[in-house]
Structure formats: structure tokens, C-alpha cells
Amino acid sequence: ILTSRGGRTSHAALVARQFGKPAVVGASTITIDLTNRLMTIGSQTIHEGQWISIDGTTGVVYEGQLETMVPDIKDPLLIKLLSWADEFRTLGVWANADYPRDASRALEYGAQGIGLCRSEHMFFETDRLPHFQRMILTDYPVERKEALAALLPFQRQDFAGLFRVMKGRPVIIRLIDPPLHEFLPDLVELVSELADLKIRLKHATDMAAIDTLLAEIRQKEQLRKRAQILREANPMLGLRGVRLGIYIPELTTMQVRAIFEAACMVVKEGIDVHPEVMIPLTSHVNELVHQRSVLEAEAKAVMSEHGMEIVYKFGTMIELPRAALTADRIAEHAEFFSFGTNDLTQTTFGISRDDAETGFLIEYMESGILPANPFAMLDRDGVGALIDIAVKRGR
């Protein structure tokens, strides 16, 4: 993966690492022309279909196809070396995994659990996105429930796959986090597409073509209106995370049901399951109390339907300064904490990760204002101090 925007700690880079894909992110000297399917670097032009080779470790991109090799993670010498490290380490390593294939790769590398399954990534699949968009677009509770009911089997299947692969190891599933607008087409693109459709309609003469265009326009117009309503000045601090679960409680209910139906199903197959459900972006303890009541009621209902008891944990992600400072109150209702250091760093410094890494942050590091990129190296005095406070107060 090669991008002209973002940075090495941006979400795109994190996901690329999770997928095991070499990535060079934020190569600002390249210009990507999507219309003509090419990119330019200075006077050089690379067309779609030409080979380039990417070294995700050094950040170097080569023209042409270099000879490559797949690393052997089962090398006996490597396994021996890591076994020596295991004798002395005091920390365990859990992996990010959203799909069973990610979990399998993580186990091969020695992960002891799944520390973060981003449940929303599953909604972006082509067979699921229309149902999720339908849930967003409707104003009617019955239609929303129908859309969520259509999504339930997909989520259940994905969670069951993770539980099967992990075979009793802990799996932390984070409920939906991103703002809803991320699941809709870009507003500018929608306006452009609508303009194009209306021009085509103006020149259409065939009735069948006119009917098709009118249907497309109605659909796009509905998407545009909803995207306009959901548009926020600062979406990353808007309707997302725990706020979504409170705003649309049926969404939390569906996800919790999928988790526990999957757990019951896999336990019946003779496989031990240890789910841990995590609420994102908590800022006030009352948010957690609200979501815990919804979760416990649905989990109890599912376990009663299946005639079994699943041992699980309920926790939250500490990624806002207020959550860190009130961790003692939050800990009364959470069985574990996970620290979301990217959002915690953004909200502590008051800077946008993706914008800063290609802008002023470079100047800050080069001039010595900041000793290092705070998204790549933990800021011990600020963000680290908040984590320290949260741990001590939480305990």
C-alpha cells in the first residue's frame, strides 16, 4: 500500500500492519491522479498496471518488480530465540484482529489473545454495507430493526469464526466506534453524481432509461440528505463510540446478541470461549452504566435462550482525558481498561493525527519543539501521566 496522505501512525497504516501488508504512508512528494489512473513523482510517471516494489520497513519505494521472499516465522532458530525471551518477559502480546484470518496470522506470530476486534470493519463488506446504510437512512424504528436483523447473521458468523480460531484465548470485541457518516458516500461526490445524473436525465429520450435515472436520483438524493444531516464540524469528537450506542440502542443490542449467540454456538461445538466486550470513547461513568444495562439484559436473554452461561467481561477504552481522570468511578462499572493512545494523544495535545503528520508536526520535530512524534513514541509527561493516573485510580 502506498499513499500520498496520512502518516505512519495513521489509521490506514495501522490497518495495513494488521493485514500484514507492506505500506508506505504519507509520501507527500507523489501526486495520484485517479481519473487518469496514474501517479507522478517529479518528472516521472507511473501508470496503473506498472510494477513498483514497496519496502514497508525503510519506507523506500522502487520502480519495477524486485525479487522478494516470504519470511519463515516457523524458523527453528527464531522459535528458539523467542522461547528464551518468553522465560524473562513480564508482558503478554495480544493482537488486533477483525476477521478469523487475522486471528490465525496473529496466533502464528505468538499472540496470546485478541486485544482489539473492531466490529465496525465488518459492516464495510459489500454484502453488508447496504443493510447498514438502510439502518442509517430510515427514520422508522421498525425498518431500523429489520436492517439490523439482516446484519445480525453476518456479525454472528464473524465472531464465531474468531472464537473458533482463538480456542479459549481471550477476545476483546469493541462495539461500533466510527461516526455514521463514514458508512455513507462522500457528500461532495454525491452532489457531483447527482448533477451528472440530472444532466443525463435531461438528455434521455427512452422511457426505460428515464425511469432508471429517476430511481437512481431518488436514491442518491436520500443519501445526500442523510449525509448532510449527519455532517459534523468535528466528527471525531461527535456522534461516535458509546454515544452511538446510546443514540441508537438497537445497535448495541444487535452487536451484543451477535457476540453471545456466536459464543453459545461455539461452546456447543466443544470449544472454550472467553469474550470481552469493550465500550469505546467513554467520557462519563453514566455512559458506561447505560450501556452495561443494555448489554447485560441482552446477554442474559441470549444465554437463557440457549440454556447456558457464558463467562464474559465488560470494559471500556480510555481514550479521553476526562475518562483517565475519573477512572476510579469508571472502574466501579468496568472489569478492564484498554487505552486508546491515538485518540488520547489527539485529545491531550489538541491536534489531529492525520493532518499534523503531514503538516506542522514535521516542522515541530525538525526544529526540536517536540523531541519525537507523539503518535509514534508515547508522550510520557502528558499522555503517559494520564495513563498513570488512570491505572492508579482505576485500581
Please identify what each model-predicted range represents.
Residues 17-20, 56, 263:
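Generic short alpha-helical hydrophobic face used as a protein-protein interaction/packing hotspot
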Residues 1-44:
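Conformationally flexible catalytic loops at phosphate/diphosphate-handling active centers
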Residues 60-62, 68-73:
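Short, charged/polar, Gly/Pro-enriched secondary-structure boundary elements
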Residues 10, 61, 346:
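Short glycine-rich, flexible loops that bind phosphorylated cofactors or substrates
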Residues 16, 52, 259:
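Residue-level signal for inorganic ion chemistry
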Residues 58, 73-80, 84-395:
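Conserved alpha/beta-domain cores
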Residues 29-63, 140-142, 147-149, 373-382:
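A structural-propensity feature for long, helix-poor, extended segments
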